[in-house]
A protein has these predicted regions:
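Short phosphate-engaging motifs
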Residues: 1, 32, 100
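Glycine-rich, small-residue loops and helix-cap segments
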Residues: 8-9, 20-21, 28, 38, ...
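Fe-S-dependent hydro-lyases/dehydratases of central metabolism
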Residues: 5, 26, 33, 40-44
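Short helix-loop-beta junction
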Residues: 1-9
Length: 168
């Protein structure tokens, strides 16, 4: 179709993109846990009954104020930033992001845009992956590099699967 419209399409390879999902989640979850730490129920955010002390207040507030996935992301982000990893994981991810931004920028100096699907599979059925966070995270395969590279993106519907779920 593109060739019939006079549009040249080439395949490009950006090897650093293989690290996009891991890089994205290390950065995103680390920053989310850091930013959400201020929602302690004392100075910011929802305030639950303090119970007997500050520990109980924090626990009650965060239990009521954050959903399951948010809690999972906060805990994972805290682990990444923990003294056990000494911040090395986060610092490495920032370096990979900088390299990714540079490599994607080099491609965009030669081409007008990068064309790829938004998701590797048709849309999930509602509630289908709720208990499989890894599958949900992996569905971001083609969008994480866009966020990390600080470039705009557009998702265009590309049809429907046999069962009617959107592809795009």
């Amino acid at each position: 179709w593109f060739a019939s419209k006079g549009i040249q399409v080439d395949s490009v390879s950006v090897p650093v993109l293989e690290s996009a999902i891991a890089t994205y989640y290390v950065i995103a979850l680390s920053e989310a846990s850091s930013n959400l730490a201020r929602f302690d129920g004392i100075r910011y955010g929802l305030r639950e009954d303090p119970g007997k002390g500050y520990d109980e207040l924090y626990c009650a507030t965060r239990s009521a104020g954050f959903g399951r996935e948010v809690k999972r992301r906060i805990i994972t982000g805290n682990y990444v930033l923990s003294h056990h990893l000494s911040g090395d994981c986060y610092e490495s991810a920032l370096r990979v992001r900088a390299r990714m931004e540079k490599e994607v920028g080099t491609v965009l100096q030669q081409y007008d845009f990068i064309f790829c699907p938004t998701a590797p599979t048709p849309a999930f059925k509602i509630g289908e992956r709720v208990n499989d966070p890894l599958a949900m995270y992996l569905s971001d395969l083609f969008t994480t590099f866009v966020n990390l590279s600080h470039i705009p993106a557009l998702s265009i519907p590309a049809g429907k699967a046999q069962d009617g779920r959107p592809i795009g």
